[in-house]
Curated annotation (Swiss-Prot):
The modification Phosphoserine is found at S244. One of its GO terms (cellular component) is transcription factor TFIID complex. One of its GO terms (biological process) is transcription initiation at RNA polymerase II promoter. This is Putative transcription initiation factor TFIID 111 kDa subunit. It is found in: Nucleus. It comes from Schizosaccharomyces pombe (strain 972 / ATCC 24843). TFIID is composed of TATA binding protein (TBP) and a number of TBP-associated factors (TAFs). Keywords: Nucleus, Phosphoprotein, Transcription, Transcription regulation.
Length: 979
């Protein structure tokens, strides 16, 4: 190929040299011989050079097409020609061109010779083969160790630079092919094939010689000595069923066995050895039939029957040791003996009847009473156990302000019903709910779920259960952080019922058929019925689930020092609570429980302050802010019981524990006052405030049975009275009226906890005291005890079923139809029975009172006063009504047309009539006793009393009618002397 052809082939390089003559001139100016250029380019005139690589082409190929030719390469080629002349093939190596004038390299420190090269050569020869490795190592300048590549004949031609450049591409390609056999240009490598795991050969398991099993110890079981068995008191077990029935199938099986084995009592070896074999030898044809007729076994005539029977016994064959009787034989008279049926419920007394002496003196009949106790314990099995209730940590510590020592008037009047007021035209921005993951709350206790007061907010994504009380004023309510359980009670249909149904909310609790109701005797759980119940340590109440309307939601306001935040939240579950049944009674205002709880609350605060104090002392001012209802003098009086006052110098003194007092730990401090005690005390404060607002400034803790009828309903419905009445009624110590004024619903769907007399005082609904009483028998009650108890239980069931039907209604139209549309939208109900327009002030109704005053000049002036508090309005109206009733005579009472007023007048007349009737009966009985008249129509019975002083019959000597009363000499002789 000529030089011009090179330029033509490289036109695409755009180097700027389009004419080959320009390059020729350039080479000539530099003094370069053109023969060298032609030899490098592979001129056609030099055929030997056509086989060499085109250095210039490779130079252009390795360079960027945008760049021009590399002039340094041209200068280098020119210097080669000057040094070697035209015979360029005589060059031995390119290294001679560049390294002649360089100094020799010094040997490296710690040089180990050609060991590294030899190792690398061996590795390469292992991968590529010895011949290919030799070419590679010689091409890159490594020395080939001896023995690695076989010796070859010396090359006829000296390797030149062109040959090295020609082999470089082949060497690279061979190396790539060696390590990457599947390599192709422009194709992605299969890395799964390239980097496949190294194949591993399966190593067979090594054969292990089993160890010799040598027993560590030898145990021999020695049979019991027959002498010991014979001398033992325990007799051998008798062998029963000597006569056993045999079936037809057994007969056939035994007949077949006897046919196949005639000498089953003898061993087979014995039969073979004792058999006469000579008889079976066939000497001629005539003996064939004889042999077939003879038996293979021993002839029966040679065996003694008795001996065979004995052998069977010796060999242990018990098949023929029993007497086999045919039960179908009509001549046999057999009576089958049936197994005796054991009594599963064997009484305790039957076990003692064997000992006649002990049973003879069993006068107290204790076993029968033991049976009664056992039945009673199993009957109330599931109601005696208390479920565990665990409150939050801050609730057990009674953290302020959630647990106060004394509630304010505003907090008492709005007990657990804080008012939510908004400023007019104020913008409300709702914040997103705080995300709380339920997965993090799993397997955590109540203390871990709510460690601080921040976790009790409703403004998070946790599920909310809304429970609405059907009572206007429940007896007891829980505070923040206190836990309650929702228990689903299920009663079994029968003893075999093993089902355990589960609801979406609550835990299941199964009651047996005879178990007592969880609501004591004021509610029942029918067989196969599930009753959800609100359960805690203070109350129990039935729950009735309702569907949540899609338009209802919860508005939450969270107030803090930084402002108020508002949240909107869906209602996940909604329940309506029935009437609450108290578990513990509310203490009275001046009871010992209140005093003890107040002292323990003071001790709790003192112990915690002492732990934080460096010197173990405290000041009165530290306690005053927590007990706002007490002054410093009252606090000092209580501190003197367990603390002493110390003063040093002129400085202020401090209080310190006495030497015999010990500060308990935190657990002991928390146990002094429980959160339930605080709730009971708050309920007592609410009851006191309600009585004071109603005009009863003086509360009564204890009310006797004779005084119940004389007290107004407001005092009888105080929480410390109703709770005590209910607990006594559950224990059978009292009876309740069940209906009437104490009904919290006013429509007969709740129980009245007002106590009534157990001696005929209870009257069912619809029956009054004016009804004709039953005739009284001699030496009997004036009422029928069984009939009264039966009527009492029927009334309880009627009210329970009515409450269940009423609170289970989900349809608003049905609810309005049953109770009346007006009663649903009433804003305020004054009492449990009566609702009047003037006595039902709602939040938007006020009371205006006009008063007359005299000014300083004596003139009358009118002043108008407006009252907004509904409690005060109710007290004013009630007082006004009492004044009007007192000013109105009984003879002037006439129907007014107002149902509420007429009902009050009717009740007033009935009370006056009952009072007059009672006074008349008392006067009549007093007059009859004085005159000696029997009110039943019979005369006065004669008495057998005889006076020991005067001797007359009919009185005693201490009676004033005795003629010798008060005379010490007395006696019958004195009286006769006077006569």
């Amino acid at each position: 190929m000529s030089f011009d052809g090179l330029i033509v082939e490289n036109e695409n390089t755009k180097s700027g040299y389009n004419d080959g003559n320009d390059l020729t001139d350039l080479f000539k100016q530099n003094g370069t011989d053109m023969s060298v250029i032609n030899s490098l380019l592979g001129d056609t005139n030099n055929p030997g050079m056509n086989e060499s690589p085109k250095i210039l082409d490779s130079s252009f190929e390795n360079s960027n097409p945008q760049d021009g030719p590399n002039y340094e390469d041209f200068d280098f080629m020119g210097s080669i020609h000057k040094e070697f002349g035209n015979n360029i093939n005589e060059m031995d190596d390119m290294e001679d061109v560049s390294d002649d004038n360089l100094p020799e390299e010094e040997q490296a420190v710690n040089y180990t010779g050609d060991k590294d090269d030899e190792d690398f050569g061996k590795l390469l020869a292992k991968e590529m083969g010895e011949e290919a490795a030799g070419q590679v190592l010689s091409g890159v300048g490594f020395s080939i160790p001896s023995g690695l590549v076989p010796p070859s004949e010396p090359s006829k031609t000296v390797s030149s630079t062109t040959e090295e450049l020609q082999n470089e591409a082949q060497i690279r390609e061979s190396i790539v092919k060696t390590f990457f056999p599947t390599f192709e240009r422009g194709v992605l490598l299969n890395f799964s094939e390239l980097f496949k795991p190294k194949p591993v050969k399966l190593a067979p398991p090594k054969k292990k010689t089993p160890k010799v099993c040598v027993p560590g110890r030898l145990t021999l079981e020695v049979d019991t000595d027959y002498a010991i068995i014979f001398n033992s008191k325990k007799s051998l077990p008798l062998k029963r069923n000597v006569v056993s029935p045999i079936s037809t199938h057994t007969k056939k099986r035994r007949r077949t066995a006897n046919t196949s084995q005639r000498n089953d009592g003898l061993d087979l070896n014995t039969v073979f050895t004792t058999n006469d074999w000579e008889k079976n030898i066939i000497y001629d044809e005539s003996d064939v039939n004889k042999t077939n007729q003879s038996s293979f076994f021993i002839d029966k005539s040679l065996v003694d029957i008795d001996f065979a029977f004995d052998e069977n016994i010796f060999d242990g064959d018990t098949g023929t040791s029993k007497v086999v009787l045919n039960l179908n034989d009509p001549k046999l008279l057999l009576q089958p003996q049936l197994p005796k049926k054991e009594d599963s419920q064997r009484s305790f007394a039957d076990t003692h009847q064997r000992n006649s002496l002990a049973w003879k003196f069993n006068i107290s009949n204790d076993p029968a009473y033991e049976m009664l106790k056992q039945n009673h314990q199993s009957k109330v099995r599931n109601t005696l156990s208390q479920l565990a209730i665990e409150h939050a940590a801050f609730a057990e510590k009674l953290t302020f302000p959630y647990y106060k020592t004394r509630l304010s008037k505003r907090a008492v009047r709005s007990y657990h019903r804080p008012t939510m007021s908004f400023k007019p035209n104020a913008a409300i921005v709702f914040s997103p709910l705080i995300v709380r993951k339920r997965s993090k709350d799993k397997h955590k206790s109540e203390r871990e779920l709510i460690p601080t007061t921040k976790e009790i907010t409703m403004g998070d994504t946790t599920h909310a259960i809304l429970v609405e009380f059907s009572e206007e004023h429940p007896a007891v309510l829980s505070n923040a952080g206190m836990a309650s359980r929702i228990v689903n009670y299920y009663r079994k249909k029968n003893e075999q019922d093993e089902s355990r149904p589960k609801l979406e909310v609550g835990e299941s609790h199964v009651l047996d058929v005879q178990d007592r109701s969880p609501f004591w005797n004021f509610g029942s759980v029918e067989p196969g019925e599930i009753t959800p119940t609100l359960y805690n340590k203070m109350i129990r109440a039935p729950l009735f689930k309702h569907e949540v309307p899609p338009t209802d939601f919860i508005l939450i306001r969270n107030s803090s020092s930084y402002g108020s935040k508002y949240y909107l939240k869906n209602i996940n579950h909604m329940f309506v609570s029935g009437q609450t049944f108290p578990v513990t009674d509310v203490p009275g205002p001046h009871s010992r429980k209140v005093t003890t709880a107040s002292k323990n609350r003071l001790k709790m605060l003192v112990f915690r302050l002492i732990r934080r104090s460096p010197n173990g002392g405290l000041f009165i001012r530290q306690l005053s802010k927590h007990f706002s209802d007490q002054n410093e003098m009252q606090i000092r009086q209580r501190l003197k019981e367990f603390m002493e006052y110390k003063k040093k110098g002129d400085g202020p003194g401090y209080w310190k524990l006495k030497s015999n007092e010990v500060v308990p730990d935190e657990a002991g401090t928390r146990s002094m006052v429980s959160p339930e005690t605080v709730c009971l005390l708050e309920s007592m404060q609410v009851g006191v405030r309600q009585l004071e607002d109603a005009g009863y400034g003086k509360t009564m803790d204890e009310i006797n049975d004779d005084e119940d009828e004389e007290q107004p309903a407001e005092q009888l419905l105080a929480p410390w009275i109703t709770t005590r009445n209910f607990i006594n009624a559950t224990q059978g110590k009292a009876m309740l009226t069940l209906f009437g004024e104490g009904d919290p619903t006013g429509i007969g769907e709740g129980y009245s906890f007002i106590r009534t007399s157990m001696k005929g005082g209870f009257k069912p609904a619809g029956e009054t005291a004016d009804d004709k009483p039953e005739p009284q028998t001699k030496n009997a009650h004036a009422y029928n005890v069984a009939k009264q108890q039966r009527a009492y239980e029927e009334e309880i069931n009627r009210i329970w079923n009515a409450q269940k039907r009423g609170l289970s209604i989900n349809n608003l139209e049905e609810l309005a139809k049953k109770y009346g549309i007006n009663s649903i939208h009433d804003d305020y109900v004054e009492s449990n029975e009566e609702t009047t327009r003037e006595e039902t002030p709602s939040s938007d109704k006020v009371l205006r009172i006009v008063r007359l005053y005299r000014d300083k000049n004596g003139n009358l002036e009118r002043k108008q006063e407006t009252i907004h508090d509904p409690i005060v309005i109710h007290a004013y109206l009630k007082k006004r009504r009492e004044i009007d009733e007192q000013s109105t005579a009984l003879d002037a009472v006439v129907p007014t047309g107002d149902e509420a007023i007429d009902r009050r007048n009717r009740r007033r007349l009935e009370q006056e009539l009952a009072k007059s009737q009672k006074n008349w009966e008392r006067r009549r009985a007093r007059h009859a006793a004085k005159e000696g008249i029997n009110l039943n129509g019979e005369g006065r019975k004669p008495t057998t009393r005889k006076c020991s002083n005067c001797g007359q019959v009919g009185h005693m000597k201490t009676n004033k009618i005795c003629p010798l009363f008060g005379r010490p000499e007395g006696g019958l002789a004195t009286m006769l002397d006077k006569n």
